[in-house]
Amino acid sequence: MTDTVIHTESATSKYVNVVEDGTELRVHYNDTGTGNEALVLLHGSGPGATGWANFHRNVDAFANAGYRVILVDCPGWGKSDSIVCTGSRSDLNARVLAGVLDTLGIGRAHLVGNSMGGHSAVAFALSYPERVGKLVLMGGGTGGPSQFVPMPTEGIKLLQALYRDPTLENLKKMLNVFVYDASTMTEELMQTRLENMLGRRDHLENFVKSLTANPKQFPDYGHRLSEIKAPALVIWGRDDRFVPMDVGLRLVWNMPNADLHVFGRCGHWAQWEHAERFNRMVLEFLRR
């Protein structure tokens, strides 16, 4: 165990150039910790999302446990270049991640993905199985429909509405169903998220253009999940109003080496809502 260190976004902020379909993209990432094993954290698709915003309650625990922690801003989010995606968003993210790891000289990594990040981690595992250590998937991963909840879900409808009309009122509507306990969504947190969102209107506009060009940005990988042999920990919020819990069950049913943990009193953001328990659980899984 290394000494306890507090890691900051500004001190760990870096960039790398990656070529995607003939276009050079400037990709932002945070890189901290000095461990030999790399742990990549992949964020969700909400307006204003970034690697750091999604995982700031987890970085210290993982880095201080001896991992090199890399938080990637996917193209179209955070400080990375914007892009219009007309194909599979998750396969795009997987290719970009492979390029980032190539540039950093990292051959193999553990992946932790929330929502879109979970779906992108599955896409990466399908395309680059030899480069995956272990997988942790929260609130995303298959792209398939729920058997019990009409799609798109309440949360996804609010997310898409926020992209089209990025106001504080619409942000509050989305974040209030994002987590189980809406009182944890402080005014300060909402204001920071609003500033992140409005600071990159090109991201918002290009996401809407992407949806118009291809409404199915996240394909259904259900029929291929059995190909993923890497050990996987699937974590879900019982009260997730974005991606229902039965979608997570598909991962466990179809991936041969997957375990499942369900947090009660938890929405779509398990790594934030139950950060301490989540951190312990992930570290125990990685050390097996």
Swiss-Prot record:
The record marks 115 as: Transition state stabilizer. Its EC number is 3.7.1.14. The record marks 193 as: Catalytic role in ketonization of the dienol substrate (substrate destabilization). It catalyses: (2Z,4E)-2-hydroxy-6-oxonona-2,4-dienedioate + H2O = (2Z)-2-hydroxypenta-2,4-dienoate + succinate + H(+); (2Z,4E,7E)-2-hydroxy-6-oxonona-2,4,7-trienedioate + H2O = (2Z)-2-hydroxypenta-2,4-dienoate + fumarate + H(+). The active site is at 268 (proton acceptor). Residues 38-274 form the AB hydrolase-1 domain. One of its GO terms (molecular function) is protein homodimerization activity. It is an enzyme of class 3 (hydrolase). HAMAP family: MhpC. Catalyzes the cleavage of the C5-C6 bond of 2-hydroxy-6-oxononadienedioate and 2-hydroxy-6-oxononatrienedioate, a dienol ring fission product of the bacterial meta-cleavage pathway for degradation of phenylpropionic acid. This is 2-hydroxy-6-oxononadienedioate/2-hydroxy-6-oxononatrienedioate hydrolase. It comes from Burkholderia vietnamiensis (strain G4 / LMG 22486) (Burkholderia cepacia (strain R1808)). The lineage of its organism: Bacteria, Pseudomonadati, Pseudomonadota, Betaproteobacteria, Burkholderiales.
